[in-house]
């Protein structure tokens, strides 16, 4: 299988890539299939079942809302986040769903959308969509899995244990960090150069660069919105947004940087908090590689652009390419789904990606980049996913800030060494996968363990 940088970084909507972006894409794919097979006009009823982690925390993650929007033909990268609430209210009050925006059917959420805690066999985030005609006969049924980071596979792909259906031949194919580093050594390339060459299999280099700078712009817009917007986050926990107030404090007292050598970390915290508060509010974010961990790479990239002399757009492109190469290793050899391996697969992976990427743009050798990425994951091993109330708020928002700072520190440690290290990136990825498999399901995005049951919702 072949994965692109744009498979790892996708423009979407909050609060969750696996529970919001994935279900929306699956729902849209299902109704597009109805139209493709000529079944849309005959459809009078659609029933949806969300299983496992989707069933357990789907309400808090907005999975139900995502499904409704997807059935109406919306996609995460283009849906107007400003009109979502009004559209959902209209669907629910009128009891009508406009499939693909062109075929209206009756829809009662209590009857037609079920959330079931029991998982389907292949993955904790399973979904079944069924369409019926006027006689009540089932005319189409599909089973989908949201496998993390907005990736969706259908039942056929799941049966073949495939992540994507892309078999595009690449100039430098790699399955492991060992393979990746071998390409770098043989051809004298950096990791970002290997990735950029591979991207040419899909599009010209100029398009790849432009696409990555667009991703960066969305990240900047998200941070700006998070620094501007205030209030209480939705969902019932009454979590107060903090980024805007922190931004005012930092701008009001810039001379503090002269007194406090660690004041730069306040800015890193700000960037991460801003992104994840926007995500929790259902705003426009970039999966990096997931929504739950969407603040780390933007925060570290903002750190690079604001505080590192000589930073520029070329560095942004190299940063994102390197981060994607590392993310692909986790995607193919472990998981980026909190429902499958806990938060080590989300915040842990994002921390590892950001660390390796920052190390490259700061001039680190390929070996130092691998070391930084390994450190970023090694010290996130065992991290649980236990969101209070099933919401991507506590501990998720602060955890992104902690992961961002940890990534920067991993780079500093790696750059002070010669690239030689005891634990390889491949071994830590394998360890993460095994740790996730051993982790009890109550710690994997079900809101049935950890903080989720020890903190009373207010």
Report each predicted region and the residues it spans.
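C-terminal regulatory domains involved in ligand/effector binding and gene-expression control
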Residues: 76-256
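Alpha-helical support elements that line or immediately flank enzyme active sites
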Residues: 18-35, 298-310, 355-363
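Hydrophobic alpha-helical bundle architecture
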Residues: 311, 322, 328-401, 413-422
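Conserved phosphate/anionic-ligand binding catalytic regions in large, soluble enzymes, centered on
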Residues: 9-27, 281-300, 341-352
